[in-house]
């Protein structure tokens, strides 16, 4: 089984691309979805113990947690020390299931793939990319997003140009959905030797 690592800076279209891989029959694991599950599950008491006042009714309040760690590298390291091992456990379970299912290709969607060294655990890296103006427009349209938040997030992420230079495949997400589906189908066909499953 070939494991693809999908990554890219915020607002570049990772979620859309991951959904299209899934449509094409590729099992997909999302680190972000795992974090959401963990924040309302087993990570919540650990985060409350590390950052008191950030959990309400057993669920992490992401806004309060963001305020507790923004601009504080040591606090971010503490948070990652709690969350990353749990996310890795979920990823390992996904890989075992995908292998068992007989999948030729599986995809792990990890926003901080390079930043956390996770590229060493995948066979090929797929980076989603779009021009900076499109990225900023997409991100600032999100509820609760501000220039300050975007700046803080981008400071933690390796620049887009470097990600592209380290990728095996680059998906240009600035065009139409059909164009993105075509790019994804080409990757799947090239790696598996079989046409991608019909995508709508």
UniProtKB/Swiss-Prot annotation:
<dbReference type="InterPro" id="IPR001977">
    <property type="entry name" value="Depp_CoAkinase"/>
</dbReference>
<keyword id="KW-0963">Cytoplasm</keyword>
<keyword id="KW-0547">Nucleotide-binding</keyword>
<dbReference type="Pfam" id="PF01121">
    <property type="entry name" value="CoaE"/>
</dbReference>
<dbReference type="GO" id="GO:0004140">
    <property type="term" value="F:dephospho-CoA kinase activity"/>
</dbReference>
<comment type="function">
    <text>Catalyzes the phosphorylation of the 3'-hydroxyl group of dephosphocoenzyme A to form coenzyme A.</text>
</comment>
<feature type="binding site">
    <location>
        <begin position="11"/>
        <end position="16"/>
    </location>
    <ligand>
        <name>ATP</name>
    </ligand>
</feature>
<keyword id="KW-0067">ATP-binding</keyword>
<keyword id="KW-0173">Coenzyme A biosynthesis</keyword>
<dbReference type="InterPro" id="IPR027417">
    <property type="entry name" value="P-loop_NTPase"/>
</dbReference>
<keyword id="KW-0808">Transferase</keyword>
<protein>
    <recommendedName>
        <fullName>Dephospho-CoA kinase</fullName>
        <ecNumber>2.7.1.24</ecNumber>
    </recommendedName>
</protein>
<dbReference type="GO" id="GO:0015937">
    <property type="term" value="P:coenzyme A biosynthetic process"/>
</dbReference>
<comment type="similarity">
    <text>Belongs to the CoaE family.</text>
</comment>
<dbReference type="GO" id="GO:0005737">
    <property type="term" value="C:cytoplasm"/>
</dbReference>
<comment type="pathway">
    <text>Cofactor biosynthesis; coenzyme A biosynthesis; CoA from (R)-pantothenate: step 5/5.</text>
</comment>
<keyword id="KW-0418">Kinase</keyword>
<dbReference type="GO" id="GO:0005524">
    <property type="term" value="F:ATP binding"/>
</dbReference>
<feature type="domain" description="DPCK">
    <location>
        <begin position="3"/>
        <end position="200"/>
    </location>
</feature>
